[in-house]
Amino acid sequence: MSLCHIVRLDGYIQSSYLAVYPNKLMLLDGGCRPDVALVLGYIKNTLKRPISDLKVVVVTHMHPDHAGGAHKLRTATGCLIVSAAKETQWYSGVGGRVMHLVDIGLAHYVAKRQGRAITRLWYSAHLQPDLTVGDSDTIPQFDDWQVLETPGHTDRDLSLFHLPSRQVYTADLIIKLRHKFVAPFPIYDPKVYIQSLQKVKDLKPSNVMMAHGCELAIDAATFDKLIAQAPKHRRTIKDTIKHKLLWRQNDGFSLRKRKR
């Protein structure tokens, strides 16, 4: 059966997107831990459907607002977790464990800046997916959605392209601020990040769904500007902390005004 619509849910610190079909549902990203109740409540109370209709949760990458709810959603609904085919965990080793703690701390900071109530954000540093996918694969049970490997923010970022409508979910590839688009923090690999932007531009999507922002049509000129202004050097976790906590005059805005 064909897609009915895509619902944007106002998650804890990000937008979450739910693909609604007559007989099944797919969550385009795992969200934060507190988003589990939001998603299940929407399915039960707004859609008036059993939570078992949630068949797939995609995890585009391992940050707290994209992977934090995945395991709990699977426990509650029996859904499949689908993620990138990587041999190693993003948060591997001692350094990875430290980075996991830092990322959770940064998520708490963003939540505070957005005026969100303090809540638990802890989730496993290691994802245990049911299925893994690569570039050009389709999502199991949802073959109208094509997987795009769009790394750069991390080493395993996925985007999801709905083939019939040409809508694309890009997770953290592009961040929408009030009046402009910017690159995310961190940037794991600037070169492949630019290639990922070009890949999405070349699709000529009808609509771009962003985890930080909303869904918008982005024209070729805007993509070209994003590519031209993309970081030329890595943005490390140290840079990310500075960006969150300090005044970044070279970005042209104050974090006091920033809503992510």
Locate predicted features.
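Active-site HxH/HxHxD metal-binding segment of metal-dependent hydrolases
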Residues: 34-36, 44-131, 228, 232-236
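Short acidic-hydrophobic surface loop/beta-edge motif
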Residues: 19, 136-141
